[in-house]
């Protein structure tokens, strides 16, 4: 009340005025904060777009262009090895491979390929990964031991992955009328997985159909195999040119003799030489896709993320190829002189990898 002598009335009026002004100021700030929030969200979205564009720019940058070229060329070379038998195998060679002399020639190539695979694993891939693991570990011996155990686990993972691929794509769809061949000559043609020709009792048409299916299944397995090779080649070039070149050379040493066997299987399935060559050439697409997949999924943290798992994983895959697909064919040799020649060729393959390591940087 005006003119009220009570001091409490003046204090209450001042408090009411203060609260009113404070409420008006808060409402004004709340109304003005919405544009600020909208601008903050727009800025965050802009940063995300910039980050995504930077990642794509780094993927297609000039520094990565060299890796793209080397990886695609290496994968293409591995894929084109399927056409190589067309250049060296005469028309009658398909029949010659079924003989004992042809099987022995194939085992000679496989012995050299086995040495190249083992040399690449134990002289290049695993030492490179081991040295990197020991050098970058910041902790004590416990953390270093843990890193080394992870390296061993990646080797086992690579071995089991290749085992699973062979189980799924080679053995799951075998025709019941096709029994495994006991002939070591036939087994040498396709890594121990050549099948005996079914009996002609159901009719010639059924025989031809079964042979065609076996040829197409072999092409499917070859495409999957080339995809894993493309992964290995591209991932190795992401580490260094030296590792990439050595890996490509090791794959070629393994692939060329096996492609001869795959080519013979296609001839046996009823394809002519040119059709078999074109089908083998089409499997090279799997290697290119594998190389692109490996590069596009590369971690932005750099090469160190690749070395940790790619090198031991690839080593496990190569060990599976060498010890499961190649070595059993060589153990079937009974002649001591031929066995000695196989051991010498195996050592020659290892020596080639040693020389490549010394002269290729």
Swiss-Prot record:
What are the protein's UniProt keywords?
A: Cytoplasmic vesicle, Endoplasmic reticulum, Golgi apparatus, Ion transport, Membrane, Transmembrane, Transmembrane helix, Transport, Zinc, Zinc transport
Q: What happens when the gene is disrupted?
A: Homozygous knockout mice for Slc39a13 show growth retardation and results in a generalized skeletal and connective tissue disorder, namely develop progressive kyphosis after 3 or 4 weeks of age.
Motif placement: XEXPHE-motif: 254-259
Catalyzed reactions per annotation: Zn(2+)(in) = Zn(2+)(out)
Record topological domains on the Lumenal side: 1-6, 90-108, 172-232, 297-306, 361
Q: What is its main location?
A: Golgi
Per UniProt, subcellular location reads as: Golgi apparatus membrane; Cytoplasmic vesicle membrane; Endoplasmic reticulum membrane
What molecular function does GO assign, one term? protein homodimerization activity
Subunit info? Homodimer.
UniProt cross-references to PANTHER family, sorted A to Z: ZINC TRANSPORTER SLC39A7 HISTIDINE-RICH MEMBRANE PROTEIN KE4, ZINC TRANSPORTER ZIP13
The protein's name is Zinc transporter ZIP13
| Organism from which the protein derives | Mus musculus (Mouse)
């Amino acid at each position: 009340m005006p003119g009220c002598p009570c001091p409490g009335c003046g204090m209450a009026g001042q408090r009411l005025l203060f609260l009113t002004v404070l409420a008006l100021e808060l409402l004004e700030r709340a109304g003005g904060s919405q544009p600020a929030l909208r601008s903050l969200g727009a800025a965050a979205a802009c940063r995300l777009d910039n980050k995504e564009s930077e990642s794509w720019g780094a993927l297609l940058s000039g520094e990565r262009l060299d890796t793209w070229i080397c990886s695609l060329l290496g994968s293409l070379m591995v894929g084109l090895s399927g056409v190589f038998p067309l250049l060296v195998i005469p028309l009658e060679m398909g029949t010659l491979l079924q003989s004992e002399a042809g099987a022995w020639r194939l085992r000679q190539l496989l012995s050299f390929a086995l040495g190249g695979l083992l040399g690449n694993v134990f002289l290049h891939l695993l030492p490179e990964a081991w040295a990197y693991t020991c050098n970058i570990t910041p902790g004590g011996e416990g953390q270093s031991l843990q890193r080394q155990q992870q390296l061993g686990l990646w080797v086992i993972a690579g071995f089991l992955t290749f085992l699973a691929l062979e189980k799924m794509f080679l053995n799951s769809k075998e025709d019941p009328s096709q029994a495994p061949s006991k002939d070591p000559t036939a087994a040498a043609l396709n890594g121990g997985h050549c099948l005996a020709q079914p009996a002609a009792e159901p009719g010639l048409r059924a025989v031809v159909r079964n042979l065609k299916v076996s040829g197409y299944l072999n092409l499917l397995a070859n495409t999957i195999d080339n995809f894993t090779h493309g992964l290995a080649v591209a991932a190795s070039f992401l580490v260094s040119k030296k590792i990439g070149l050595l890996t490509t050379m090791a794959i070629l040493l393994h692939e060329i003799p096996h492609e001869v066997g795959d080519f013979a299987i296609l001839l046996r399935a009823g394809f002519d030489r040119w059709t078999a060559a074109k089908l083998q050439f089409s499997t090279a697409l799997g290697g290119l896709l594998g190389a692109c997949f490996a590069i596009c999924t590369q971690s932005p943290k750099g090469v160190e993320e690749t070395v940790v798992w790619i090198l031991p994983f690839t080593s496990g895959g190569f060990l599976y190829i060498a010890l499961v697909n190649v070595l059993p064919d060589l153990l079937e040799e009974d002649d001591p002189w031929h066995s000695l020649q196989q051991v010498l060729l195996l050592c020659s393959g290892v020596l080639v990898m040693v020389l490549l390591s010394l002269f290729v940087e």
